């Protein structure tokens, strides 16, 4: 296993953990309402899809998309903390340890994915893709 493959695997692991935590919280958020429940379904499906894509066909585009998903999840959480998110989660959310841990994992995934994109010669992500 190369260092480039290891870095992609770290991103995949971060995707899987994020997806799993969000999926586990779907029922509790449906109890709050349809919007929060649907929001958590989306927050589960997006990183899960990224994990599958990076596992099957790692590429710069897949890494960029994954970085965007992680950034969106982190920014979305910050918005929910500050003011709520219209339609999906209109109520402000209190800071919780599990949420903070999840955001730390997503931030790690974002940083590693961005690092792979910044140093393409060092990561050799394009060579991981076979045609």
Regions found by a protein language model. Give the residues of each.
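Membrane-interface extramembranous regions
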Residues: 1-131
């Amino acid at each position: 296993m190369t260092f480039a493959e290891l870095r992609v695997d770290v991103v995949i692991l971060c995707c899987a953990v994020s997806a799993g935590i969000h999926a586990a919280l779907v029922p509790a958020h449906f109890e709050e309402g349809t919007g929060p429940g649907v929001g958590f379904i989306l927050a589960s499906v997006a990183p899960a899809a990224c994990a599958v894509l990076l596992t099957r066909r790692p590429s710069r585009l897949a890494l960029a998309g994954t970085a965007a998903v992680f950034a969106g999840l982190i920014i979305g959480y910050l918005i929910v903390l500050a003011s709520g998110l219209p339609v999906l989660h209109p109520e402000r959310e209190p800071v919780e340890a599990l949420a903070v841990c999840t955001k730390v994992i997503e931030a790690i995934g974002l940083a590693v994915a961005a690092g792979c994109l910044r140093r393409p010669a060092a990561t050799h992500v394009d060579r991981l893709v076979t045609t």
